[in-house]
From Swiss-Prot:
Signal peptide: none annotated. This is Dual-specificity RNA methyltransferase RlmN. It comes from the Bacteria. It comes from Sinorhizobium fredii (strain NBRC 101917 / NGR234). GO terms for biological process: rRNA base methylation; tRNA methylation. The gene is rlmN.
């Protein structure tokens, strides 16, 4: 199939021109817990007796109304707004590019300040609309340290952790762009849930390993689930980890969100190759941590993610060992057809084999949905994320277009 025909499968929408924010040392009020916001306000002269009220006002404007300009805070005095503008910011990150897949999936390339990285950094955030729900896939790091052999993000070296502000900014910006705040319009032709919120769920499944950035991820998710602000139910927030065992219990105890494990193999020999962190935290330790996860029940199951790699991990014997491995753990098993990317040596399992694998697991009593590939034409599918600052070589990109899907962006 000619590359031009493949390109027509996706509408690649350039983001509107957004002026980069000038370099500034102003701290952001986004991503601060209430007590930390209160301390900053007191330091800038807000009377103690007013602090609680001022924090409530700011919280409402930032997380209920979704404003990104202090001047929009109409019930805050002019003097207070001027003080806030002088000392703080609530600006959104720069949108470098917005791509819209033929299936309605949206991917944003966002640029953040260097903050120790030496130059501005870029990450990707993905929105996946489905009937009755809309899921936002959020990144926690710029790049990744884990080098999972089947994952495109793993080919990009870790640059730095994202701050709590930058993690939350992905959600705020997506809600801006989708018209998911009060008095905002949904883009014409956008595929979103017919009723209610445009973003109903968030998954920490973007770039990076969330549990290697525990404190910032914790703060961001506690704010996202705060009932007086963004108000996302913790049962609609899923954190995915490759298996950082010491932090798994803390995730349940201190954050309380749903847990997903990037499993992908049923024995240590294969998982050492696919997910190298397994050499440090082997399957026995990982399964023990899962069994001890706070709140684990049939109503709060752990999701195990399993990418289907042809002739690697997709045999019926693998399925039998998977059922044995998870025995006694309330679980759902997401089977993920492998999403190809330039330079990979893996292939996706045949569809008949994926269905046979799923049927065996289902008959053993586990829900085993096959994840429908979304956003492949804009490199937004599971395992395909990689920031534009790590652009693929032109020859790889052209080969990939000819092989399957649209390019990620012109050099």
């Amino acid at each position: 199939m000619p590359a031009t025909e493949i390109l027509n499968r996706a509408d690649i929408v350039k983001a509107p021109q957004v002026r980069p924010q000038p370099q500034t040392e102003k701290p952001s009020l986004i991503g601060l817990l209430r007590e930390d916001m209160a301390k900053l306000l007191v330091e800038k002269g807000v009377p103690e007796r007013q602090v609680k009220m001022r924090v409530s006002q700011l919280w409402h404007w930032l997380y209920v109304r979704g404003v990104s300009d202090f001047d929009q805070m109409s019930n805050v005095s002019k003097d207070m707004r001027e003080m806030l503008k002088e000392h703080f910011t609530v600006a959104r990150p720069e949108i470098v590019e917005e791509q819209v897949s033929g299936d309605g999936t949206r991917k944003w390339l966002l640029r953040f300040p260097p903050r120790g990285a030496g130059r501005p950094v870029e990450i990707e955030t993905v929105y996946i609309p489905e009937e009755g729900r809309g899921t936002l896939c959020i990144s926690s790091q710029v790049g990744c340290t884990l080098t999972c052999s089947f994952c495109h993000t793993g080919t990009q070296k870790l640059v730095r952790n994202l701050t709590a502000e930058e993690i939350l900014a992905q959600l705020l910006l997506a809600r801006d762009r989708l018209g998911d705040f009060p008095e905002r319009d949904t883009p014409q032709g956008a595929i979103v849930p017919a009723e209610g919120r445009k973003i109903t769920n968030i998954v920490m499944m973007g770039m990076g390993e969330p549990l290697y950035n525990f404190d910032n991820v914790k703060t961001a998710l506690l704010i996202a689930s705060d009932g007086d602000g963004l108000s996302l139910s913790k049962r609609r927030i899923t954190l995915s980890t490759s298996g950082i065992v010491p932090e798994i219990y803390r995730t349940g105890e201190e954050i309380g969100v749903m847990l997903a494990i990037s499993l992908h193999a049923v024995n240590d020999e294969l998982r050492d190759m696919l997910v190298p962190i397994n050499k440090k935290y082997p399957l026995k330790e990982l399964m023990e941590a899962c069994r001890a996860y706070p709140g684990l029940s049939n109503a709060r199951r752990i999701t195990f993610e399993y990418v289907m790699l042809k002739d690697v991990n997709d045999s019926l014997q693998d399925a039998k060992e998977l059922v044995k491995l998870l025995k006694g753990i309330p679980a759902k098993i997401n089977l993920i057809p492998f999403n190809p990317w330039p330079g990979t040596n893996y292939q996706c399992s045949d569809w008949e084999q994926i269905e046979a694998f799923a049927d065996f697991i289902n008959q053993a009593g586990y829900a085993s949905p096959i994840r429908t590939p979304r956003g492949r034409d804009i490199l937004a599918a599971c395992g395909q994320l990689k920031s534009e600052s790590e652009r693929m070589r032109k020859v790889d990109r052209l080969a990939f277009e000819a092989m399957m899907i649209a390019n990620h962006g012109e050099d």
